[in-house]
């Protein structure tokens, strides 16, 4: 369906849990989070009702996120049932891949089309520091397994932080020359824990691109959040997601369901609609989703205000 600004909204990002097995420095506090009561989070059946209702309003792309979505025991069942909705054409997942190696085959059989893997360093010690304890070898094994079973495309999402991992930019780019893997560099945002790092850690996509004169622009879909490039010898592309330096609101086609059951029409707006109260009434649920999509804000104002208006943390929203 169209929002009141004429944008076609066909993409729903679903945060199935706010829990995670890592505590990345820009996402979670060092002490982790307090586990929510079961009644305060969306159950599998409730999530599926929202997905089903959204599909009736023109949503045909679903991405499951977290926290870490693979913590959810029924994620394969959720993917399978989603794949049986005839109007859903694309089912993706964003994961840290710590648990992916043992589950990627069943997920692909269930209907998962592609994965984005959050990976902010290729160095074992640095990865452990950024994630506060993560084992990078589990991520590498998951990538290898995903490639071996033909999961395509595989994208690596990398949040670039000045003085922390910006010296690895070339290493990440060069992966596209060796493997059929896409890279997405994401600008650090002043949201949640990222506020603490933003002043000293922010580096713009433009600055990175300007250092690499051999990058070749690639035609990009209007609704894409990334500007795409590649090297002459690349197997896949290199994308730059630039919410701070070059916002993409005019072509935004997505809304987000949080693990608590609120629908966020804009990642960086405090406006959201509680859907959990309506999952028992299909007509009311459809009406509330329709209302939220129609009233999606025209744009965020992070560039001007240097801060997200969202009161939620990234692990609660799913990015």
From Swiss-Prot:
Catalyzes the cyclization of GTP to (8S)-3',8-cyclo-7,8-dihydroguanosine 5'-triphosphate. Residues 4-227 form the Radical SAM core domain. Belongs to the radical SAM superfamily. MoaA family. InterPro entries: Aldolase_TIM (IPR013785), Elp3/MiaA/NifB-like_rSAM (IPR006638), MoaA (IPR013483), MoaA_NifB_PqqE_Fe-S-bd_CS (IPR000385), MoaA_twitch (IPR010505), MoCo_biosynth_MoaA/MoaC (IPR050105), rSAM (IPR007197). This is GTP 3',8-cyclase. GO terms for molecular function: 4 iron, 4 sulfur cluster binding; cyclic pyranopterin monophosphate synthase activity; GTP 3',8'-cyclase activity; GTP binding; metal ion binding; S-adenosyl-L-methionine binding. Keywords: 4Fe-4S, GTP-binding, Iron, Iron-sulfur, Lyase, Metal-binding, Molybdenum cofactor biosynthesis, Nucleotide-binding, S-adenosyl-L-methionine. Signal peptide: none annotated. It is an enzyme of class 4 (lyase). Its cofactor is [4Fe-4S] cluster. SMART domains: Elp3. The gene is moaA. [4Fe-4S] cluster 1 binds at residues 20, 24, 27. [4Fe-4S] cluster 2 binds at residues 249, 252, 266. S-adenosyl-L-methionine binds at residues 26, 67, 118, 189. GTP binds at residues 13, 63, 94, 155, 254-256.
